A protein has these predicted regions:
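N-terminal type II signal-anchor transmembrane helix
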Residues: 2-36
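Bacterial extracytoplasmic/cell-wall-associated proteins, especially those involved in peptidoglycan
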Residues: 118, 122, 126-129, 144-354
Length: 354
């Protein structure tokens, strides 16, 4: 009798010893192979299923050992995409799951000069984890704008942005460039990164800005018109000269690009008489005197440093008019109205025959 009890106890102890050994072995690294594997945990996945999936992926030695560990562990598993390898212990994997150490991807995004902030919102939302509407809502969020203005980080942002007649306060202030953004970047972080680039670019022309007699808002507004009207540096400087002269002469700028923006149409759309006469604070085609000698209320697109420099280094010419060949993009400049009308007629005839 005693002998049987001893044998039974011995067997139990042996089983416990072997089980403990198996458990410890099962929670060890499966291999020294450090090749990364993407492992996805969907919302609502059970711990038992996670152990099974890890075993099927060849990442752990024992599904049973991990199943037992997860059963007693108080870890709160978070859904997401994780980067794992067989060289990790199951405990290290579970620690990743419980801390939410998910894999963050990044996206390379190019934002082009001359595009509107609504275009930027579309491009960004296609690649990042926020919607176009969320980005535009952030751009228009007065509390966020005030935090930027008062932060001391962006001295070029002033209360001029808070004019409620401006469609999008940060239009013209987000520098066009190629950026690397994390997938989970917020609209706020993206905007701040772009403003950092704007600050860097403006630092190249600090002295010219100081001596210009213009506010940053005026410079960027004028630069946005130049950006849309000209392609070459030489033409940009001449276009800037024309606009400054028209302001000095108390004339309307008469720029179609401002009308397109003011009525929410894209370049190339047909502008109607109603569009040309629309009384919005961007429309420099108004001829009733309300826009004489005035810039639009704010920028109509986001601008390159080339257009900013053109505004600060306008040419020494004395042109009052310009017209572009819509077929070739070439811009022609004139000093008087009759010369301008003749060139318009000539170009219309040329484009009609091509």
């Amino acid at each position: 009798m005693k002998k049987g009890v001893i044998i039974s106890c011995g067997i139990i102890i042996l089983i416990l010893f072997l089980s403990a050994g198996y458990y410890v072995w099962g929670l060890g690294r499966k291999s020294k192979n450090s090749n990364d594997v993407t492992f996805i945990i969907s919302a609502g996945t059970s711990k038992k299923t996670i152990a099974k999936n890890l075993a099927n992926a060849g990442l752990i030695r024992s599904e049973i050992a991990l199943d037992v560990y997860l059963y007693f562990a108080k870890s709160n598993i978070q859904a997401g995409e994780y980067t794992l390898s067989a060289s990790m212990t199951p405990k290290e994997m579970v620690n990743k799951f419980s801390t939410g150490d998910i894999t963050i991807h990044s996206e390379t995004i190019t934002l082009i000069e001359g595009k509107r902030i609504t275009d930027y919102a579309s491009t960004l939302s296609e690649k990042l984890d926020f919607t176009k509407e969320e980005f535009l809502n952030t751009v228009n969020d007065e509390e966020f704008l005030n935090s930027l203005i008062n932060s001391g980080e962006y001295s070029f942002l002033t209360s001029e942005l808070l004019n409620t007649d401006i469609y999008y306060p940060l239009e013209g202030y987000l520098y066009p460039d190629t950026y690397e953004f994390l997938d989970n970047a917020t609209p706020e972080s993206v905007i701040k990164t772009m403003l950092d680039h704007t600050k860097l670019k403006l630092s190249e022309v600090t002295e010219l800005i100081s001596s210009s007699g213009l506010s940053i808002h005026q410079i960027l507004t004028m630069a946005s018109l130049v950006e849309k009207e000209a392609n070459s540096d030489t033409d940009r400087e001449k276009v800037a000269q024309v606009f400054f002269k028209r302001i000095s002469d108390n004339m309307p700028l008469g720029s179609d690009v401002t009308t397109y923006y003011g009525v929410g149409k894209e370049m190339g759309d047909v502008l109607t008489i109603n569009d040309l006469n629309d009384r919005n604070p961007y429309n420099t085609r108004l001829t009733d005197g309300t826009m004489n000698g005035k810039l639009p209320i704010g920028p109509i697109c986001n601008v390159s440093i080339s257009s900013i420099k053109a505004v600060l280094n306008k040419s020494n010419t004395n042109y009052t008019y310009f017209v572009a060949n819509t077929c070739t993009g070439e811009v022609f400049f004139q000093e008087d109205y009759q010369e301008f009308l003749s060139k318009v007629t000539e170009l219309q005839s040329l484009c009609a025959t091509n």
